[in-house]
Swiss-Prot record:
SUPFAM superfamilies: Anticodon-binding domain of a subclass of class I aminoacyl-tRNA synthetases, Nucleotidylyl transferase, tRNA-binding arm, ValRS/IleRS/LeuRS editing domain. The keyword Aminoacyl-tRNA synthetase applies. One of its GO terms (molecular function) is ATP binding. This is Valine--tRNA ligase. Its main location: cytoplasm. Belongs to the class-I aminoacyl-tRNA synthetase family. ValS type 1 subfamily. A motif ('HIGH' region) lies at residues 43-53. The keyword Manganese does not apply. ValRS has two distinct active sites: one for aminoacylation and one for editing. The misactivated threonine is translocated from the active site to the editing site. Pfam families: Anticodon_1, tRNA-synt_1, Val_tRNA-synt_C. Keywords: Aminoacyl-tRNA synthetase, ATP-binding, Coiled coil, Cytoplasm, Ligase, Nucleotide-binding, Protein biosynthesis. Catalyzes the attachment of valine to tRNA(Val). As ValRS can inadvertently accommodate and process structurally similar amino acids such as threonine, to avoid such errors, it has a 'posttransfer' editing activity that hydrolyzes mischarged Thr-tRNA(Val) in a tRNA-dependent manner. A motif ('KMSKS' region) lies at residues 551-555.
Amino acid sequence: MTQLASSYDPKSFETDLYEAWEKAGHFKPSGTGEPYTILLPPPNVTGTLHMGHAFQQTLMDALVRYHRMRGYDTLWQVGTDHAGIATEMVVSRNLALEGKGETRDSLGREGFIGKVWEWKQQSGDTIERQMRRLGTSADWSRSTFTMDPQPSAAVNEAFVRWYEQGLIYRGQRLVNWDPVLKTAISDLEVESAEEDGFLWSIAYTLDEGLSYEHVERDADGVETLRETRDYLVVATTRPETLLGDTAVMVHPEDKRYAHLIGKSVVLPLTGRRVPVIADDYVDRAFGTGVVKVTPAHDFNDYEVGVRHSLPMINLFTPVAALNENAPERFQGLDRYAARKAVLAELEDLGILVETKAHKLQVPRGDRTGQVIEPYLTDQWFVKMDDLAKRGLELVEDGSISFVPPNWINTYRHWMNNIQDWCISRQLWWGHRIPAWFDEATGSCYVGRSEEEVRAKHNLGSDVVLNQESDVLETWFSSQLWPFSTLGWPNEQAMAERGFDRYLPSSVLITGFDIIFFWVARMIMATDNLVGKIPFKDVYFTGLIRDGQGQKMSKSKGNVLDPLDIIDGITIDDLVAKRTGGLMQPKMVEKIEKATRKEFPDGIAAHGADALRFTIAALATHGRDIKFDMNRAEGYKNFCNKLWNASRFALMNTEGAAFTGVPRPRTDAERWILARLAATTAEAQGHFAAYRFDLLAQCLYEFAWNAFCDWFLELSKPALNGADAADAESTRHTLLYVLEALLRLLHPLTPFITEQLWQQLAPRLGLAETTLSLRPYPTAAEFEGDFAQAEADVEWLKAVISAVRRVRSELNVAPSKLVPLRLQAGLEQDRVRIERFSASLSFLLKLDSIQWLAEGESAPPAAAAIVGELKLLVPLEGLVDLDAERVRLDKEIARVEAEKEKSETKLAKFTDKVPPAVVEQERVRLADWNTQLAGLREQRAKL
């Protein structure tokens, strides 16, 4: 075994340790014990590891390692998603950069898909390599790609079954259409933002010589206009769509227009007659109370159109130019050119009543930035009503638990307002829909293969069948992830991969932003297709933001690459990474300036453990999580402190060979074992509640404060003392507690704990070859009758802290011996002083400890109070009296402030506060009063 390095350098061992773990097969399921399964939300195969991935994967890995150490049969199922649209865009962009003139369309379907597979082979494992660097202990031999044969077979099976159940149908519906990508996209891929626009008011002439009395009133209800009109005024932000209007509507209870319901208006620029209909959707108080209805180009109008059986006129081509349904003079115009032409004609006709500035929500595709068009096309859909009803039941009856539970309300709202799901996409990369059309008749057949279709429907070789060209949207295959990865529907594969053993999984860790698009659909699909729940718990994480609370994005130039935090990056490389390939070149200078200001020296290497511990510490149950680099620096220091503490332990136990549980001889040993038992119980509770932030906090406090700051100090008198038995016992306890601490920390910080444990294990006679196979600590391992020792050592700590504070404030050199005089106090204080005199003398550098006799005057001294006990450090030869007066005044002010806080807290307590809490605060207040009296008395003497 090589000697532990003198300084903490994570780069020197993290990669080697990971390779050793993986080579030894430690990440594979053991096949014994209770199963514990986690599904990785499959990242896009196009992607690289970002902070959101690192955040979720750290928490998943902590749970997997924790349960593996507890003897569970752990399976962490990983893989990647084919990411239809994103992948097509990346490959198309790469083709353009190659400069060979090849495009998606010039290559054709098969040629382009071949290029996609080539690209996938080159870069598809990038994100998995990055996950390894983070320390994820997944079973890589089971890694699955959603386009692999097995999950592809599952996709076909699910489609066919749902089609046969009547859940999948083909029909015309409105979808979100991206005119650049020329495909439908999901709601998740649409980003709406407020933009400046216009609201145009247009006169629609009433048919058949109809008229009505139009009245306008001001805010006070005073009539300002009364006239007879033979036209209705409608307002729109999209005047070009009036060419596709099939009605105008009013509220059924609007008396102004009651006699016009069922009549017609003449549609401007077309001469078509469209009806005046009544619908509750209309807001009578907005504008004139008359609304145009364009069912093929507005989602709300579509619903109105369905209710009233209105014609649906699609005006646009797939690239958002006007098609043959528009008047000939507008055909072929881009939608924005058509808008200008329509407005010009309306103005020439004198029926453009008003134009005014208007704020409106504009939906844009998240990948192209283009305005999304509500578009009427033939698409494949899944009927959602019955699936959603069952999906909601499984959460509301507790079969599946949400953490935090408030997300149930969001889930319920969506499930109660669900729409049929458009599952087809006009792409080439993805799972091609298993449907075939008869070239002669247009009849559609669905089956697992063309051969199955022909056999089932008795179609001879003379019948020409063409497969549907559309592919399924990515979420269709993703919803099958819980069971397609376990071999479904192939029975042999299901048996080999442990379908019955590992489904349902134990917990899903994912972002709340895909609760509808993925979580809900997995619940519905798993229940319907295999009769199980997909997972028992869902833990929703917040979204990672930068230190100022801003969303991390390439365009903002504030993205942090987790690998840069782990391995470090120079400032020039960081600037290049943040500014390269920006869609808005004008942002380059601004981003470079901000980056150089925030990271003047680049980002130092922190190691994987420091990043992982930072993530755990930040993992609150809130919606947003601010990532603060200062926290990462702090936890790097934590790792460094743990390293140095381990070096201390190893240097003081050279040649040691212990076995079993130590039998503590000193109070310091008993105290640290009691703290260890309490910390272990607390840690297990936090794991069970998914409170990673509190877990990190309690382990940090034990490691830094209890173990490093106090136990190592308190062990020094025994290690350096004359009592050989005390020294030997302390050495055993030192190693024993450190080994337990490494086990406690291992799920969060696997690398440093493994590296240190390898040095420690031989001295404790441990048989395991790796820390990852050691059992996670239980509180019962460390419990004992240590209550008195705990109280005694807490008193000792208070005395040491008080005297050290005095020495520090007096600027007494650390090596200088000083006397300590004691006054007042209880009998218990005298017993403890006697008991701990050697430790006090050693740790406080005291040349003498003496009690003042009752009634004896105290010399001029710096004073501190612990309970009833007054601690006096005589000032003669140490300090001038003026400085001590200043010090005492500051100490009195501090204690007065604490006393006031305690009094305020007691005054605010209500009847609902537990009596024990009230009593605890009263005791605290009494202690402050005692300290204050002693300090004032000492000040009076000076």
